[in-house]
């Protein structure tokens, strides 16, 4: 049995980015043969990636990139908030955002097929899964290309906003993006609010108003009032500016001689059902697995 030295482990780690203990195990199994150990490790990491790729990803980050006349916002997911802070994961997310802005892929599948680091985006993603031991997925992205201005805002990497706007004052774009992150409007104006959201709000308002026992004409006015209030609350232009409660966003923009054309808001994990771990069951499963080894 060949002696496994620290320098051998370090060399294998430098080649594969695998954890130190995994490198040592592979070298031991390969009897000190570095090339064989690397092959064993790549197979092992590949298997690790395939197992991880089926797990729920409800944590992650939002990353942004603006360059020239294009900007992008992307959401990448992982399984834990610990990995969401991992340097390699964060670097990959930034690279993906830049690729979206510069290459204009049609969808996530097209993005995944783009060349990256001598391979493809998806191959790099799978290698990252093998390295960190968690599933990593590119969930969604949005790209703006315009002769107007683009502003982005990230709040703790979990909330991201991209805004297309006009006007000379770049602070306006930053302020609007920050406001969107804080107040989370669903549309630019009342007219842009999706019909299904309005219908839902109207049904809720009708049920509440019906319980009041008031005459039908009064109930109808109550319902209309509730719907109008809702539309103002969820449309960007009608919202009260978070930095000045004496102005709406529309008034602030008018004073700055600016307009907002469109925006997008991403919140990490929005709509994804997080896995609920049963700690006792997890420990029992680990014990059972250990007995089988």
UniProtKB/Swiss-Prot annotation:
Family membership: Belongs to the EF-Ts family.
PANTHER family on file: ELONGATION FACTOR TS (PTHR11741), ELONGATION FACTOR TS, MITOCHONDRIAL (PTHR11741:SF0)
A single GO cellular-component term on record: cytoplasm
InterPro entries: EF-Ts_dimer_sf, Transl_elong_EFTs/EF1B, Transl_elong_EFTs/EF1B_dimer, Transl_elong_Ts_CS, UBA-like_sf
Family annotation (HAMAP family): EF_Ts
NCBIfam families on file: tsf
Family annotation (PROSITE patterns): EF_TS_2 (PS01127)
Disulphide bridges, residue numbers: none
UniProt GO MF annotations: translation elongation factor activity
UniProt subcellular location: Cytoplasm
Species in which this protein is naturally found: Burkholderia ambifaria (strain MC40-6)
UniProt-recorded name of the protein: Elongation factor Ts
CDD domains assigned: UBA_EF-Ts
Protein purpose: Associates with the EF-Tu.GDP complex and induces the exchange of GDP to GTP. It remains bound to the aminoacyl-tRNA.EF-Tu.GTP complex up to the GTP hydrolysis stage on the ribosome.
Domain of life: Bacteria
């Amino acid at each position: 049995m060949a002696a496994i030295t620290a320098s051998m482990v370090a060399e294998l780690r430098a080649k594969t980015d695998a954890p130190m203990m995994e490198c040592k195990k592979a070298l031991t199994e390969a009897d000190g043969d570095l090339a064989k150990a690397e092959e064993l490790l790549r197979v092992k990491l590949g298997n690790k990636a395939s197992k991880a790729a089926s797990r729920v990803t409800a944590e992650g980050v939002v990353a942004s990139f603006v360059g020239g006349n294009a900007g992008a916002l992307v959401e990448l997911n992982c399984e834990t908030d610990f990995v969401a802070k991992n340097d390699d994961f964060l670097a990959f997310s930034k690279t993906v955002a830049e690729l979206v802005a510069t290459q204009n892929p049609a969808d996530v599948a097209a993005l995944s097929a783009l060349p990256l680091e001598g391979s493809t985006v998806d191959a790099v993603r799978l290698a990252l899964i093998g390295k960190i031991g968690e599933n990593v997925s590119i969930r969604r992205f949005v790209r703006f290309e315009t002769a107007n201005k683009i502003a982005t805002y990230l709040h703790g990497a979990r909330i991201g906003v991209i805004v297309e706007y006009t006007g000379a004052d770049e602070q306006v774009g930053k302020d609007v993006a920050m406001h969107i992150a804080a107040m989370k409007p669903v549309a630019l104006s009342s007219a842009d609010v999706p019909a299904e959201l309005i219908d839902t709000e109207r049904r809720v308002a009708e049920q509440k108003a019906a319980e009041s026992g008031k005459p039908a004409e009064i109930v109808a006015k109550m319902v209309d009032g509730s719907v109008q209030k809702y539309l103002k609350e969820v449309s960007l232009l009608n919202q009260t500016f978070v930095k000045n409660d004496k102005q709406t966003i529309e008034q602030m923009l008018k004073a700055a001689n600016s307009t907002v054309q469109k925006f997008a808001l991403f919140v990490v994990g929005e709509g994804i059902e997080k896995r609920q771990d049963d700690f006792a069951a997890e420990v029992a499963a680990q014990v059972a697995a250990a007995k089988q080894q």
